[in-house]
Amino acid sequence: MESRNLLRQLPAVDQLLQHPRLKDLSRENYKMVLALTRQVLDDWRLKIKNGATTIPDPGQLAREIENRYHEAGRSSLRPVINATGVVLHTNLGRAILSPAARAAALTAAGRYTNLEYDLEKGQRGNRYSHVTGLLKELTGAEEALVVNNNAAAVLLALSTLAAGRETIISRGQLVEIGGSFRIPEVMGQSGTRLVEVGTTNKTYIHDYERAVGPDTALLLKVHPSNYRIQGFTREVTTAELVELGRRVGVPVMEDLGSGFLIDLEAYGITGEPTVQAEINQGVDVVTFSGDKLLGGPQAGIIVGRRDLVAAMAGHPLTRALRIDKMNLAALEATLRAYRNPDRAVKEIPTLAALVALPEDLRLRAEELQKLLTSVLGSRARVGLMPTTSQAGGGSLPVTELPSWAITIRPEQGGAAGLVTALRRTDPPVLARVQDDLLLLDVRTLLPGEGEELARALVQALEGAVHGGES
């Protein structure tokens, strides 16, 4: 009986639409306001049927409709503050572009460009010409090609060089590359026949040698950029595989995945070969990503032997997988920075974050601690602690990056509730929880985000206190 009375007390749609809060919105977009009004009323009818004992008044209902209207008008793709310490966070978009790359992409987006027009000859040009020269210069390869991501680069290479024939690969390199996409599945889609050799932890060059036959089209090496097998292991070296390929007349291809263009060993980052090193060892085709360790836009980069890359450029898949003008412009600007490695490390945000020294990170953390202590006041205790960052993005899996984190201990509520509340602030903040402390790793905080972070924490702490840890 009570639920029927409550249902009757809900205002009619037409009545609610006359509320002053909704009149202006209705003039702006009547269909959306009407749909949201019906949605809100339906939601409350369901709540009443499920046991709700009170209902909001018309003003509160109108406010709920208004809030949903404004939320629906916001972009779904939003900036977030990354305080996780994961530099190449796949779920947060991986690499942050340099100022030069952002400017180049913006120009390409807002102006006509000579994307496929040869200004000297006055005729159709080649879109890849804007980056192929740079890639050849930086890697030492004979030829280069760019598609829209590295999985596409692998698919194109296998489809061109090995469709209908055999590709030999070590069992220990049959990796999953993220999003449930696995190397064997990509290989199967290309039309090549997978020939597995060796075991998960040990593969020798004679395993490859015994598998080579008249139908062998390719010797494939996949660099394990997102994992490491340690202990009782044996892996075929690049030099061994290249020597075998030369001896039997079969091309060698390597999927580097991440793809460094400069050696960062001086900064303590090891275990990731550079593209140049693999080309210099004689690998015929190398593929790698643009938006991982390179620090550029999403792209799949192919470098290697002139005849093999030229064959890929002429494959029908190339058009389906081609890179767009904005990413191409950003990639060109990113590659230009690599002509001066010292400049690249400073200007490309991914590299700058990876090589940041612990002592510099501590200074940044101390400055941020002062700001947050002042702003948060009695809402939380703010501290500092050493922590460890990660490269992320399926890169440098065993490399630990010493860092510093701000710690937040709320005076009311716990860190679990706070980390949830931070995801709902504007902008959202992504952080970690450890021992009931909220950790904000300064390695992945961008310049100028301190004030935004402080405001978000105030908003989240008040929300966490009032809303609990739900």
UniProtKB/Swiss-Prot annotation:
Gene3D superfamilies: 3.90.1150.180, Type I PLP-dependent aspartate aminotransferase-like (Major domain). It is found in: Cytoplasm. Its cofactor is pyridoxal 5'-phosphate. GO terms for cellular component: cytoplasm. Pathway: Aminoacyl-tRNA biosynthesis; selenocysteinyl-tRNA(Sec) biosynthesis; selenocysteinyl-tRNA(Sec) from L-seryl-tRNA(Sec) (bacterial route): step 1/1. Keywords: Cytoplasm, Protein biosynthesis, Pyridoxal phosphate, Selenium, Transferase. Its EC number is 2.9.1.1. It catalyses: L-seryl-tRNA(Sec) + selenophosphate + H(+) = L-selenocysteinyl-tRNA(Sec) + phosphate. Coiled coil: none annotated. Disulfide bonds: none annotated. InterPro entries: PyrdxlP-dep_Trfase, PyrdxlP-dep_Trfase_major, SelA-like, SelA_trans, SelA_trans_N_dom. Its main location: cytoplasm. Signal peptide: none annotated. GO terms for biological process: conversion of seryl-tRNAsec to selenocys-tRNAsec; selenocysteine incorporation. The modification N6-(pyridoxal phosphate)lysine is found at residue 292. Converts seryl-tRNA(Sec) to selenocysteinyl-tRNA(Sec) required for selenoprotein biosynthesis. Belongs to the SelA family. This is L-seryl-tRNA(Sec) selenium transferase. It comes from Moorella thermoacetica.
